[in-house]
Amino acid sequence: MDTKDFKRLEKMYSPRYLPGLDGLRAFAVIGIIIYHLNAQWLSGGFLGVDTFFVISGYLITSLLISEYYRTQKIDLLEFWKRRLKRLIPAVLFLICVVLTFTLIFKPELIIQMKRDAIAAIFYVSNWWYISQNVDYFNQFAIEPLKHLWSLAIEEQFYLLFPLVITFLLHRFKPRNIIQTLFIVSLISLGLMIVIHFITGDNSRVYFGTDTRLQTLLLGCILAFIWPPFALKKDISKKIVVSLDIIGISGFAVLMTLFFIVGDQDQWIYNGGFYIISFATLFIIAIAVHPSSLFAKFLSMKPLLIIGKRSYSLYLWHYPIIVFVNSYYVQGQIPVYVYIIEILLTALMAEISYRFIETPIRKKGFKAFAFLPKKKGQFARTVLVILLLVPSIVVLSGQFDALGKQHEAEKKEKKTEFKTTKKKVVKKDKQEDKQTANSKEDIKKSSPLLIGDSVMVDIGNVFTKKIPNAQIDGKVGRQLVDATPIVKSQYKDYAKKGQKVVVELGTNGAFTKDQLNELLDSFGKADIYLVSIRVPRDYEGRINKLIYEAAEKRSNVHLVDWYKASAGHPEYFAYDGIHLEYAGSKALTDLIVKTMETHATNKK
């Protein structure tokens, strides 16, 4: 490329502020926050992360090629310095607060937090969670730094991509660069599909830099095709209308997906993320156009305020939600708690944005110089020191012993429970005799209980009630996994008079056909089907299928755990799914009572 070309391009690629992108960021971060507050409210809110990825790829590439066309080079050190000032101080502030809070209020989590924090500091959280087999979509574990996986991917991208794009710009034409980036994006897509097919692990492909690169690269490609700083403002009204129709349509599709997509939908791991990200390109393209009315909509002041703070809001919302929710049972959290979480998120995000991020962005690390005469700067420095000291001590491992001690104490408390005396109700003698016989029959029976981790929870309690019961519970089991096991191992139970308890659906949705196939595999056996209580978006759909099966099939009897457990937070562990001893006892009693009632009615 000769000097004349560079001079022409220099005028075209002068950077300018793109408010439409901040407006789009606002919608993305709101979606993410709502999803983490309660996935049942916005099941596809997690797609906001993909929106961030596409925006990042687009904006960073636009800035890099703008610099290259204006100066005929890219100052990599200056680029990395800007990224460092923009991203790292806020993350370090967050980590210090989280570690200090953990030390004071959640000492049993010290060791886990130390490891997660180290991974976050070095921006390898995503690979750390993959190595630890962490499930991203398990929102019930107390992992307040888990959301930093996406920042790890972005930072890895910021570190390596400028090197790649500099090399490509020096040696190839834009058309060839676009082709190269497109091919690599397809390779990333292929890796996601293949790895997901082989492992069946949603979180591996969700966390992986290799499998998520596709989304970032689509944004990079758009930067070459639709450079924001080269777009003309003076265009015909027809073109403006066409642009707005495209932008509004794409935005409507994305918002619809936020509501209808679920994190257990398998299609999103088999090309869905790529398609959704591709559709997002059209929204971005119109959002950055200087003549678009849609861009003006995204540039409204409330959206800009949220968008400019989207990074801070993303950082703070998750640990606040996780820590506050840890004092409540998931799925039974009062509305006022959600309001408190939103207010705390806004407060901490504003503190981070105003007193940490903005000063460093303007003054660099001089903003933390120890100047007692400047009250604001002095207070900021003292706060950082107060948070930094305990954080460094935690990271050094000095409190590991304390963490182990509290962890052991908490495990012991899990076995504690309260019992209450029930009022005795007098019954007819004949009824008492039938009930007694039924109870004795049930106690001597040998039912099969098949289920997931909830079945594991009740196993020991249930066998004390019915010693001959066969318990087959497995952590993470889904209904579709149980059907082949039943057909191969439990054929003897597919006979009239046999008793089977089925407790499945906690770990993911299933279809009517899949449920029918499982029930059919038990033949004419008496099946006791347990409804589920799980604070996820599929809870209602699954229970509807369970209720319908119990109503339509004469040999299927409903064990309505969903109804019986309502208003009993003491039954559940923090996640609102797994059971404390009181819950295990209550579910066991409910199953046994249902079996006894059915046995009595038969007589």
From Swiss-Prot:
- The organism's superkingdom is given as Bacteria
Q: How does it sit in the membrane?
A: Multi-pass membrane protein
A Pfam family hit: Acyl_transf_3
Classify the main location.
membrane
Sorted keywords for this record are: Acyltransferase, Cell membrane, Membrane, Transferase, Transmembrane, Transmembrane helix, Virulence
| Stretches that traverse the bilayer | 17-37, 45-65, 87-107, 148-168, 177-197, 211-231, 239-259, 268-288, 311-331, 333-353, 382-402
Q: Which Gene3D superfamilies match?
A: SGNH hydrolase (3.40.50.1110)
Q: Would you tell me the protein name for this molecule?
A: O-acetyltransferase OatA
Species per Swiss-Prot/TrEMBL record: Staphylococcus aureus (strain NCTC 8325 / PS 47)
Q: Which gene encodes it?
A: oatA
